[in-house]
Curated annotation (Swiss-Prot):
Subunit structure: Monomer.
Protein's gene: afsA
Name of the protein: 2-oxo-3-(phosphooxy)propyl 3-oxoalkanoate synthase
Role played: Involved in the biosynthesis of A factor (2-isocapryloyl-3R-hydroxymethyl-gamma-butyrolactone), a gamma-butyrolactone autoregulator that triggers secondary metabolism and morphogenesis in Streptomyces. Catalyzes beta-ketoacyl transfer from 8-methyl-3-oxononanoyl-acyl carrier protein (ACP) to the hydroxyl group of dihydroxyacetone phosphate (DHAP), thus producing an 8-methyl-3-oxononanoyl-DHAP ester.
Domain of life: Bacteria
Species, as recorded: Streptomyces griseus subsp. griseus (strain JCM 4626 / CBS 651.72 / NBRC 13350 / KCC S-0626 / ISP 5235)
Length: 314
């Protein structure tokens, strides 16, 4: 993604507002459907620390349980992402309508603390913001970290790098790209089960006839992956494509991606094929699968990620 300008604004003064609990509107986490918004309330713990209470659903149609009745690690990652957007909007005053651009996203889940058990799970996310660069009194880029707790147990951790763009600056950066992209799949999906999915409508890969390479299958009608008009393919869809490719190369047992290290290099555009390649990495642990996944479009790298985790079945 394009580099941000050099930022030299001083850090503004900010009251801590410690221990004031605030409810969460779904617009603060960039969702339009309540069932896809997971944070419930937040409180500022310090200048750059926030506590967010969230609920992981047990019956979400897209983020369904995986493996041996575990919450999907990508659901946990999405809860992290939403908690970060909430902290920056509500805690730092970044206006709604600004663009939230992740360039890095790493997470580690502890599956022994992610059992579903047939009911929603309440979690607490501590959000840490650091290395903030400021422009006109607002953060323009920075890093964010998460610690996810289920009761007194650490269920996951994560770190990310992010940038923020005003609507005007974003349109200038994007140039002539249409504001609203529409994409309907023209190719058949791969079979759902080997890709780690139960429903064919959630499959985001099409076969190419080449081993370890698929075409990204983009359907802007998907209610969870496309919440509102967008001018590029969302990062959530790219992560899902990576998971599905990893399942396909891992073999019949698939993979539960409890760890991920992801870099987003540029936008994936509508109207041009994006090729997803996956290769199993060598490892000494027979119970863990590690897969490197990359996305390429028009000869450029869109994203790269390394997913690791136990086999989903067996």
């Amino acid at each position: 993604m394009p580099e941000a300008a050099v930022l030299i604004d001083p850090v503004p003064t900010m009251d801590a507002e410690a221990e004031v609990v605030h409810p969460v509107g779904i617009e603060m986490v960039h969702r339009t459907r309540p069932e896809d918004a997971f944070p419930r309330n937040w409180v500022r713990l310090g200048r750059d620390r926030f506590a967010v209470e969230a609920v992981l659903p047990h019956d979400h149609p897209f983020f369904a349980p995986v493996g041996d009745d575990l919450h999907d690690p990508l659901l946990v990652a999405e809860a992290m992402r939403q908690a970060a957007m909430l902290a920056f909007h509500a805690g730092y005053g970044i206006p709604l309508g600004y663009h939230f651009l992740l360039t890095e996203l790493d997470y580690v889940c502890h599956p022994e603390h992610l059992g579903v058990g047939g009911e929603p799970t309440e979690i607490g996310l501590e959000v840490f913001c650091s290395d903030l660069k400021w422009r006109a009194g607002l953060p323009a880029q920075g890093r964010v970290g998460w610690a996810v707790h289920r009761g007194d147990r650490l269920a996951a951790t994560g770190v990310a790098a992010t940038r923020f763009s005003t609507p005007k600056a974003y349109r200038r950066m994007r140039g002539d790209v249409p504001v609203e992209g529409i994409s309907l799949p023209e190719t058949a999906p791969v079979p759902a089960s080997p890709a780690g999915r139960a429903r064919v409508e959630d499959v985001v890969l099409s076969g190419t006839g080449r081993e370890g390479v698929w075409e990204l299958r983009v359907d802007t009608r998907h209610p969870t992956l496309f919440q509102r008009p967008n001018d590029h393919v969302p990062g959530m869809l790219l992560l899902e494509a990576a998971r599905q490719a990893a399942c396909l190369v891992a073999g019949p047992a698939g993979i539960v991606p409890v760890e991920a290290r992801t870099r987003f290099h540029r936008y994936s555009e509508f109207g041009s094929p994006c090729w997803i390649g996956a290769v199993v990495q060598p490892g000494a642990d027979e119970d863990t699968v590690t897969v490197r996944v990359t996305g390429h479009q028009d000869g450029e790298t869109v994203f790269s990620t390394v997913l690791s985790g136990p086999r989903a079945h067996g």
